Each structure stands twice: as structure tokens, then as C-alpha cells.
């Protein structure tokens, strides 16, 4: 019976994902490959300081993107849950990228990560994270689970807080979409010769969302006391409507 309930809950989530907007977020998905032209568009973005990575979204296509998020709660806990994903299918050049998500307060409730196959039928990763889960931004390395993304395929991924394992329809879920693409030729040489501090801006200008988030987050991990880096990430997230994530 628990298996049937779990399958029904997952089916409901996927059905929502394939529909129209949820919680005010649009759901665009698979898009054209990023081009070298995106690298030239950064100069057009004048509203952000030069030190803040400016994200240039790729052209958008079929449905897909961020769902859920916002402040949710149970009788035991109230928290904000969000994936660090755009409101469209975000790009990465990595075969085994990292996925980032945020929870505003610690929780002792079970937290599960699911990555669905491109058809949205079977999970290629389904795991429960160690409890308790601390407040803040969390990183999931797909390499830790031997999960690889195929080029040109869009995957949907979810983080779920499970208040009642017997009633999975009560899960509090946030999700995003990710697609692996080839790195533009003009970007390869720039990345190879650039200092790590320049990588967030280079990836952002090329429309590579997940690589941008990973690059700025890795700088934060290397210098956790540098508040300017955290402010840069906060400003980057705000560009895709992710506010309230200040950690």
C-alpha cells in the first residue's frame, strides 16, 4: 500500500510539473543550445553591479521549470523550502553536476531527493538525506550517487520534506529542471584561462545556470567568511525570482 501511495504522489507531482504555472512560477523547459552570442549579452545588463554574476537565460521551449517553494509548514515545523533553480529548464555542461537547494530552518523530518528520467516515468536517483537536516543551502553531488546526465536530455528533480510517510500526498516538495548541453566553443578557452573568481560571470553570460550557481557556491565553500560572495549569490538568485535565500 505504501508503494501505491508513493507512486500516486509522484504521479501528482509530475502532473503538476507538466501543467501550467504553480505558485506564480512559469514552467518553460527544453531550449536551444546556448550560443557564443550569449557571451556578448552580459554588457546589456546594467542593473547589477559588475561583481555580481549576470544570468542571461537561454531561449525557452517546452514546459518545465521550478515548482513549489515558498514558506510551508506542518503542525511541528514551519520553514521555507526551495531548489536553486530557474523558472525554466536550466543548463549545465557537466555530466555529473551539483544540485543546490535551501531550507530556512533545521528539520528532523525525513528529506528525500528524487531525480526523474527524461520521460518523467522512473527515478534515476531516489535517496533519503541524513537527518536532522540543518538550515541553509545544501549541495547534492550527483557524482556521489554515480548518476550521469545524458547530453540533450532534460531531467526533473525534487526535494521533498516528508511529514507523514503513510500519506505521501502531504509531502512538501520543491522541484526544478536541468538539461546537459555542450559548452560553446568561445567559452571553453575563456574558462580554461580565467581565474575561479571570473567563472560565475562567464557561465552566467553563457546561460549556464547550474554551472553559474556551482561556481559561486564553490567560491563560498572555499572562503566561507567572505560575505561579499554570499551577497553575490543572493543577487544572482534574485534574478530568477528566488528571494529570501540569504545564507
State what each model feature region is.
Residues 219, 224, 230-247:
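Preference for solvent-exposed, low-hydrophobicity sequence contexts
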Residues 99-101, 137-165, 169-172, 176-177:
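Extracytoplasmic/surface-exposed domains of secreted proteins
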Residues 86-105:
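Contiguous beta-strand segments within globular domains
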Residues 25-80:
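N-proximal, low-complexity, solvent-exposed accessory regions that precede a main structured/catalytic
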Residues 39-44, 48-61, 85, 89, ...:
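Extended, polar beta-sheet/loop recognition surfaces of beta-rich domains
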Residues 21-22:
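N-terminal signal peptide c-region/cleavage motif recognized by signal peptidases
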Residues 123-134:
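Solvent-exposed serine/threonine-rich low-complexity stretches and specific carbohydrate-binding patches
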